[in-house]
Amino acid sequence: MAYAYGQCTWGVAARMNQLGLKLKGRNGEKISIINTMGNGQDWVATASSLGGETGSTPRAGAIVSFVGGTHGTPAIYGHVAFVEKVYDDGSFLVSETNYGGNPNYTFRKISQADSAISFAYTCLLYTSDA
């Protein structure tokens, strides 16, 4: 993996790899993340440019990008995290690395999506008929 260990981009790429996920294309195709997805705030825009399905609603398994300078993120780079769970009230739990400079995986509950947050949706790399 070409992302620097402990950076937010590394954390999301590693989590997707661990779960066997790809980006979900607008037509249902599976799209690999690339080594040049950009800074955290760029991931959803890059996913869209690759044909990925994106939106403003959290879904479990989605990539979430935060605009730089919002939600406690660096102004220049923004942040990217992985949506682990969505709650009935619209809040969602993310796993992430390098939030607040911590290179380890941490979890954080986001109260709701807003205009500084966007999502790229994922799908399983392999499916079973069993």
Annotate each predicted stretch with a short phrase.
Residues 1-85, 95-96:
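Secreted/periplasmic proteins that engage bacterial cell-wall peptidoglycan
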Residues 81, 92, 117:
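A broad, low-specificity signal marking well-ordered, structured residues that form hydrophobic/aromatic
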Residues 86-90:
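Short, conserved beta-turn/loop elements at beta-strand boundaries and strand-helix junctions
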Residues 91-111:
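Short solvent-exposed strand/turn elements
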Residues 106-125:
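Intrinsically disordered, low-complexity, charged/polar segments
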Residues 126-130:
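Conserved small/polar residues in nucleotide/adenosyl-binding loops
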